[in-house]
Amino acid sequence: MSGSTAPRRRTRGTASSAPSPPAGLRLDVRTGDAAHAPVHSVTWRLERLGYGAAQQQVPAGVLKTEGARVELARATPRVTEWFQNSPAGLEHGFTLPERPSANPPGEPLRLVMAVTGDLVPEADATGQSLNLRNAAGRAVMSYAKLKVWDATGAELPATMQSAAGSVTLTVSEATARYPLTIDPVFAQQAYVKASVVPHK
């Protein structure tokens, strides 16, 4: 994809910045080993962050790459979105250095991601994972292993929900000590290429 930067395994190099403000992650998923196997594309973009209905729009980020890790840092609200290859799959995490609001309204924290492309997210009944399904309803890959912890290492209750065109991560963080780390994983049996999507 023009203007994109891919987080790849075993890459080397120093930190770098992108010429265009990046906004999200595109996944190109091949569902078989053959070169002619179907390829699906899905784009994830962190769109809003906040408590209940008091959501802040999330702007494009500043890109930094370091080895197999790619980070998108946003200033307002302060959140760093990051992607890193691991044996479990592609980790898609968020680090919040401080509580988004000095006076949270007593509702859980929500991160809302816009999802577009030819794979549709469908959360399971537990709220701990979701599948990305193709037009035939087949699960092509999963978004799961959601873990959230605070500065003390304490794990926090968290769930994921899906709706038409979006995925929401909900975190109960009223007693948390920041910074906060949110860390789900894209897992698949297929080939996946990840690219950063420029802001439009």
Where are these regions (language model features)?
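Residues that cap or anchor secondary-structure elements
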Residues: M1-S195
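Glycine-centered small-residue motifs that form tight turns
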Residues: V197-K200
